[in-house]
From Swiss-Prot:
Involved in unsaturated fatty acids biosynthesis. Catalyzes the dehydration of short chain beta-hydroxyacyl-ACPs and long chain saturated and unsaturated beta-hydroxyacyl-ACPs. Belongs to the thioester dehydratase family. FabZ subfamily. GO terms for cellular component: cytoplasm; membrane. NCBIfam families: fabZ, PRK00006.1. Keywords: Cytoplasm, Lipid A biosynthesis, Lipid biosynthesis, Lipid metabolism, Lyase. It comes from the Bacteria. GO terms for molecular function: (3R)-hydroxyacyl-[acyl-carrier-protein] dehydratase activity. This is 3-hydroxyacyl-[acyl-carrier-protein] dehydratase FabZ. It catalyses: a (3R)-hydroxyacyl-[ACP] = a (2E)-enoyl-[ACP] + H2O. Gene3D superfamilies: Hotdog Thioesterase. Its EC number is 4.2.1.59. It holds the Pfam family FabA.
Amino acid sequence: MSETAERKPILDVVGIQKLLPHRPPFLLVDRVVEFEPNKRVVALKGVTMNEPFFQGHFPAQPVMPGVLILEALAQAAALLATLSMKPEEVNDKITYLMGIDAARFRRPVVPGDRLELEVEVTKQKGAVWKQTGVARVDGQVVAEAEFMAMLADRER
């Protein structure tokens, strides 16, 4: 078990739901364990056999779909941007994913794994953020990608 996995969360799933519009079963981040404003976030996702996607992907040999690993990284990236905002701005903004580049999958993620989602800002100009994300299980890279996202006004 990694040092990060044992640390007390900075933000739990209840707090995450106050910041992200996603809800189960599409909320793919359980907690935030490290955060540096405008720089970096580390979040965790416990992968259990109860995940609805395992019913069809694949019943005899369950594997978390790669696109959902990328979505978990994108949600961690959105948390990084949201947590970096001024508190009075949080309820007025939403993060939209604009693009994914250089996505690579290194090994399957299966029930019982704990995804460690690390996202770092590579560039930020105005409302547009460029970030890199790496997903690990037990310290081994399982997926990585580059993301571009934009903070926009929330529709009321």
